[in-house]
From Swiss-Prot:
Native source organism of the sequence: Thioalkalivibrio sulfidiphilus (strain HL-EbGR7)
One GO term describing the cellular component: cytoplasm
Catalytic activity, reaction form: (S)-4-amino-5-oxopentanoate = 5-aminolevulinate
Gene behind the chain: hemL
Entry protein name: Glutamate-1-semialdehyde 2,1-aminomutase
Modified residues (N6-(pyridoxal phosphate)lysine): K265
GO BP of this protein: protoporphyrinogen IX biosynthetic process
Cofactor entry: pyridoxal 5'-phosphate
């Protein structure tokens, strides 16, 4: 037995399911979760001291690697001045200025403490600004665990939303319409019927919660045009893609400007931070300027702002994203080659330092196609890679991430581990 096994048993006595976020429980792959003791650079070390090359990166934030010395020092310096004040600080201004500089669609920004809080607040703001109640989201896109967003599709595009979790009132779910990602015709048809009631369309510009699925050409542009036509706000959930696929986020990468943007993960440099922002006339509806209420005790926490600002400084350095994209492509291409040599069908998607591997013969562009991939092979592959010291997301529906800390040797070791793992999975 491992120490992780013992810790998981102990955790289940006082923590529901033994984890504080469900995907960590390894339900999607089976077995006991790995309990992490520490991390540095591209590596994590479990409670037994085993080293893993990490492609989860705390689900995205660790773009510069774990415990980056400059980020750690920024946190130490900020902490010496106090952990939290519940009052305005200068560092909040610096963070807001930098975010608005990097993401030109954001005239103003409000800091919060998580991505979920950012999306919940952005939707409330969109409803308050437009005076409408309905929202459109897409199947397979995850926007946090707010009640309005834990809704699945009904039996057809125009049906009312259905709660996907107990505790979500049906009356609230009715206002959420869940459509097919990358299907602009379905959006157009829906808006033709209820467009005057829709406050916003919220979308992950690159879906990262049905693995990694980029938008098909014209999809984001079409959403922008339809929102303009029907007077709805377009919200880009860039909690995952913000500062990950490009310095200006997916909106810069694809050249589409939303009305509101939600951010998280990288903006906190590993600390719990979220943000939402956008057009000035929309953001000015927020209290204390306007009637839409939003607040938070730890919003703009000075230690978290210090970590985030230093991370933004690091990723703004020349060549950062070119190198990150190159490294990701080297790793993905190497794994695909290994799959081909093992006779295992596999496709992949990549945008910048974000990637997805699918056990499928066909390209994957939406949630249904993602569910048709070979989940049993993924589970076997995951555990083979874990045994060989490569830590992938413990779910076939989660994107992977490369950091600037991954070395050429790390990439080569990963590709070799994949080749051995895929041969084992294939039985050859």
């Amino acid at each position: 037995m491992t120490r992780s096994h013992d810790l998981f048993k102990a955790a289940q006595r006082h923590i529901p399911g033994g984890v504080n976020s469900p995907v960590r429980a390894f339900k999607g792959v089976g077995g006991d979760p790995v309990f992490i003791q520490r991390a540095e650079g591209a590596y994590m070390y479990d409670a037994d001291g085993k080293r893993y090359i990490d492609y989860v990166g705390s689900w995205g934030p660790m773009i510069a690697g774990h415990a980056h010395p400059e980020v750690v020092e920024a946190v130490r310096e900020a902490a010496r001045g106090g952990l939290s004040f519940g009052a305005p600080t200068e560092i909040e201004i610096r963070m807001a200025e930098r975010v608005c500089e990097l993401v030109p669609s954001m005239d103003m920004v409000r800091m919060v403490s998580s991505g979920t809080e950012a999306t919940m607040s952005a939707i409330r703001l969109a409803r308050g600004f437009t005076g409408r109640d309905k929202i459109i989201k897409f199947e397979g896109c995850y926007h946090g665990h707010g009640d309005s967003l834990l809704v699945k599709a009904g039996s057809g595009a125009l049906t009312l939303g259905v709660p996907s979790s107990p505790g979500v009132p049906a009356a609230l779910a009715e206002h959420t319409l869940t459509l097919t990602y990358n299907d602009l015709d379905e959006v157009r048809e829906t808006l033709a019927h209820v467009g005057g009631q829709v406050a916003c369309i919220i979308v992950e510009p690159v879906a990262g919660n049905m693995n990694c699925i980029p938008p098909v050409p014209g999809f984001l542009e079409g959403l922008r045009e339809l929102c303009d036509e029907y007077g709805a706000l377009l919200i880009f959930d860039e909690v995952m893609t913000g500062f990950r696929v490009a310095l200006g986020g997916a909106q810069a990468h694809y050249g589409v400007k939303p009305d509101l943007t939600t951010l998280g993960k990288i903006i906190g440099g590993g600390m719990p931070v979220g943000a939402f922002g956008g057009r000035r006339e929309v953001m000015e509806q927020l209290a204390p300027l306007g009637p839409v209420y939003q607040a938070g005790t730890l919003s703009g926490n000075p230690v978290a702002m210090a970590a985030g600002l230093k991370t933004l400084e690091i990723i703004s350095r020349p060549g950062f994203y070119d190198e990150l994209t190159r490294k990701t492509r080297v790793m993905v291409d190497g794994v695909l080659t290994a799959a081909g040599e093992a006779g295992i069908p596999m496709t992949a998607n990549q945008v910048g330092g974000m990637f997805g591997l699918f056990f499928s013969e066909q390209p994957v562009t939406n949630f249904y196609q993602a569910t048709q991939c070979d989940l049993d092979r993924f589970r076997l592959f995951f555990h083979e890679m874990l045994e060989r010291g490569v830590y992938l997301a413990p779910s076939a529906y989660e994107a992977g991430f490369v950091s600037s800390a991954h070395s050429e040797a790390d990439l080569a070791e990963t590709i070799e581990a994949a080749a051995r793992s895929l041969r084992e999975v294939s039985g050859n």
